[in-house]
Amino acid sequence: MKTALKPWLLAAAAACVLGPGAAAQAADLAALRNGGTLRVAIANEIPYGYMDLNGEAKGVGPDVAKHIAEALGIGKIEWTTTAFGSLIPGLQADRYDMVAAEMAILPQRCEQVLYSEPNSSYGEGLLVAKGNPKNLHDYENFAASDHKIAIMAGADQLEILQALKVPASRIVTIANNADAISTVTTGRADGYAATSLTVGELAAKSRGKAEAARDFKDPVVDGQPVRSWGGFAFSKDSGALRDAVNQELAKFKKTEDWKKIMSGYGFSAEDASQSFERSTAQLCAG
């Protein structure tokens, strides 16, 4: 479901820049409710969090964040887009108060930021050139051959590939998803590792030049298929804001409106159900 932004929502097309000495400060919930502006960052990644052609924030993260902000009595949101790898540093440098990019909740990230409870859950995918000329169907193929696999800088696919013993020499790092199609169609890499939803979106945008690998097999690490749980992220000093968001998120996830947002952006009923299967405490513990 794509909900329209309310007139009072503000959009910023690029991240604001602070000096090198900037440090994270706790977002004051009372001030936000009293006319303040909630600064929210996304990584311009469909369907998780992105700016559309009208400069409006869309995606499962922004749509749910808008509902939560309204429920908390926060009247203004300023949206910032930045590279995925800059999301956590931006929180730490007080460039924004919250990240709504459905960033996977991982132990190493939990050491750097606070997470809400999961808002979403999603599996993996593989983008390949049209016709899948190298016959690639899983990430393990890249550990057992000389083929190269691309990932986005800062994405958790790096940890997955490392766990599967894919050599660093076969991993190509690109700045963002926008470069993925050209990366696989020009042969710079033989595949692009990303979530299944991202891969599907890229394949649709490629105009037939690339496709999602068919019969893709989810990677298995430590005997378990890999699945990610995404949540909202905050600076370590923003516990009060995180707790307030958690309260409203728990309520909203019980509604049909939340389910419609998930399905509207391509999440399956299983994805929605899986989002309840892990807590942030469990995910942070590893």
List where the protein language model places each region.
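Flexible hinge/capping segments at coil-to-helix
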Residues: 130-148
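Ligand-binding cleft/hinge of the Venus flytrap
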Residues: 51-53, 65-75, 140-143, 155-175, ...
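Alpha-to-beta junction loops
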Residues: 38-39, 74-76, 93-101, 146-148, ...
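Extended ligand-binding regions for polar small-molecule ligands
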Residues: 62-71, 132-133, 140, 155, ...
